Each structure stands twice: as structure tokens, then as C-alpha cells.
Design a protein with these regions (language model features):
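Sec-dependent bacterial lipoprotein signal peptides
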Residues: 1-18
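OB-fold and OB-like single-stranded nucleic-acid-recognition modules
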Residues: 18-161
């Protein structure tokens, strides 16, 4: 009896360990959105933000990502919701990140600190972007859409059994 309880508890712990955030995205971060960071000066705040790539700009020694922010799920992955945005932000990290891999609309999560603000134009609108000095750039795998087609069994009777 004790062995059975111990086995069940061990299995629960092992399965619980599988359902966690990727290690680079773990930690304590300020619960603010990019829009809130612009409204009040949040320079120096540690954040974990994510969303979809709008543009990737490789520079001489760093790469900057212009992002549209979305909420993150419990794993730190951005939700894919067209109207659920928290504003826009720019995240920069030392090194080269290939724009062919980091294409527009790919999902990325960042951790880092807000190190300032930058004004850019979106069309004719002057937009103030929070600027994040990223410690982690986490590119998520592409979500695959799977169409599940259910068919009746090979006999004519339908039922709950």
C-alpha cells in the first residue's frame, strides 16, 4: 500500500515537472505591459514580455526587434489573439539574430530590463516605444494547425458506447 502511494506521488511530481516554463524565462518580473510602462516611467524594471515580431533590425553589434505585445500564458508563450495587445516595444540583444529565422509574426519572449524609451513613427503617428535591454531572446516553435476529422465507426450503429 505504501509503495503504491509513493509511486503515485512520484509520478505526480515527475508529470508536474514537465509542465513548467522554459528555464531561461523563469524568474520574478514586474507585472506591467509596454503600454503601462510608457504611461509611467518604469526605467530599470525587470520585465518578461512577448508577442509577435513586426520587424528585425540587425545592427553592427546587436539586433533589435520591434514587437507587438500580447499576454503570456503560464509557460511564458505569447497568446495568439489579434486584438489582445499590450502595446508595442523594442527589445535589443547583443549579437546577430538572423531575420530569415526571426520572421514577422513569429512568437518571441524576452526577459530583460527597461533601459529607456524611443520615439518612432507608425504611419503618421508618433509612437513612444519602451526599450528593453534583453537578457534572453526565446523564439517559440511555429504553431501547427491540425484539422481533426471524426468519422463514424465502420458499422451503422451510433451510440454512446
Amino acid at each position: 500500500m505504501k509503495f503504491r502511494l509513493l509511486a503515485i506521488a512520484g509520478l505526480a511530481i515527475l508529470l508536474g515537472a514537465c509542465a513548467s516554463q522554459p528555464r531561461p524565462l523563469q524568474g520574478e518580473f514586474a507585472a506591467i505591459t509596454p503600454r503601462e510602462a510608457v504611461d509611467r516611467d518604469s526605467t530599470g524594471a525587470a520585465v518578461r514580455w512577448g508577442g509577435r515580431i513586426i520587424r528585425v533590425e540587425p545592427h553592427e553589434n546587436r539586433t533589435c526587434f520591434e514587437m507587438i505585445s500580447t499576454r503570456l500564458d503560464v509557460y511564458g508563450r505569447p497568446y495568439w489573439a489579434s486584438d489582445d495587445t499590450g502595446g508595442r516595444f523594442i527589445a535589443c540583444r547583443l549579437g546577430f539574430y538572423d531575420p530569415a529565422l526571426f520572421q514577422p509574426n513569429r512568437e518571441v519572449s524576452f526577459t530583460g530590463r527597461i533601459d529607456g524609451y524611443e520615439n518612432r513613427r507608425i504611419g503618421q503617428y508618433d509612437y513612444r516605444f519602451p526599450h528593453v535591454a534583453a537578457d534572453v531572446v526565446y523564439l517559440w516553435p511555429v504553431r501547427e494547425r491540425v484539422n481533426v476529422i471524426t468519422r463514424p465507426p465502420p458499422w451503422p450503429w451510433w451510440g454512446w458506447w
